[in-house]
Amino acid sequence: MSCIQTRAILQQDIIIYGQLDNVKNVLQKAIKHKYGRRMVSIVPIMNTVIPQPAVAECFVTFGCEKIKKRLLCLDTAAFMRYNYMRETCPPVYCFFLEPLGGGRDLMYRIGIDLGGTNIAVGLVDESMNIVVKQSMPTQAQRAPELIVDDMATLCRRVAAEKGIAISEVSAVGIASPGIVDNATGRVEYANNLPFRKLPIADMLKSRIGELPVHIANDANAAAWGEAVAGAAKGSSNSVMITLGTGVGGGVIIDNKILTGFNNAGAELGHIVISAGGRQCSCGRLGCWEAYSSATALINMTREKLEECRIKGRHTLIEDIANERGKISGRTACDAMRAGDEAAAEVFREYVYYLACGLVNIINIFQPEVISLGGGISNEGDFLLKPLIPMVRKEQYGGGIVPETQIRIAKLGNDAGIVGAAMLK
């Protein structure tokens, strides 16, 4: 097994041991961990003989982006095996072709989570951690140009807070509500923002300089964030479901965001799970969102409370609602924890319909991981414990093929920022 040993020779050196045909892989990890985006030269040291290296190409990976670098290195392990008749190579000496430049060897990206209420912007390092974050109100009724002005201002602020110029950022990503087209950099339509065929990427570039600017739907960006840095990290195929006011979704297939031919794909909240069922906010009947959103859980709780009042049945739902002044997504869960049977009935119904939608998603996409985000996901294991067995019971091929892992999302409200920053 290869190992990496770092050594401070002029503060620019790495020593790598291992099979030569694994040098590229080991070197990627060494550069990513230690030195950011610097180009290196690799020269094998064999006693006093230093053969002339050939020019090859290598991919140095930072998070999800592969940055192509030309490296001076041995072409293949065949040279070593042919000349030295052995499988392993001696240490490989690496040195930088350019100075470190004041230690700023890290790669930063900026992620913008644009919402109808707030604009949140974060500076993200190569480990996909948000190192600086700032926000301001969107004031969605304003002209789009003013909203983009504020996005640019926040980009400059987060860079300045870290002590770097905006020009030193490698890329910027925007997570926007609505139908967006990354190929053109446009928001085609957004329901809660005054955007119609808005060339938002070019508008932002004109304000911050000619940096690469990528764009994705906000739910897709959050799914991408969980895929690269959250609950689904390490998987190539994953789905994120957000259980909030509505049900949002994003699908990652073979490490790519599924958008559909018209950039309106993965509207998972509007798959129909009960024909002619509950009214959805979209105007249709029986959508998953009408059964599995936080709004749906609140409606179910209210209906159960009214039923209990009619039947003269006491329920802790009423006590908790009176104490807090309202019914929320937590009301039924908290009452159930306290042993209330009416609340348990509500929660079982909610989990049943949530499982129905998840089974459909698994049967269609067969993702390695489904991550659950949004307010309801804060229930954690209290939600997962009854949910997972119900899904396992109904999914096709359950117990025979490898099973999809259902997890609570890790990044919370930062998923959109991280996902936007790591767009490509």
Explain the meaning of each model-derived region.
Residues 2, 6-8, 30, 77:
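Short linear motifs in low-complexity or flexible loops
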Residues 50-52, 56-58, 64, 69-73, ...:
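Short, often N-terminal, low-complexity regions
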Residues 113, 173-177, 216, 240-246, ...:
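Short beta-strand segments
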Residues 134-136, 191, 261:
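Short hydrophobic alpha-helix segments
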Residues 191-197, 214-220, 240-243, 407-413:
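Active-site nucleophile and cofactor-binding loops and adjacent substrate-binding regions
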Residues 264-267:
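Structural signature of FAD isoalloxazine-binding scaffolds in flavoprotein oxidoreductases
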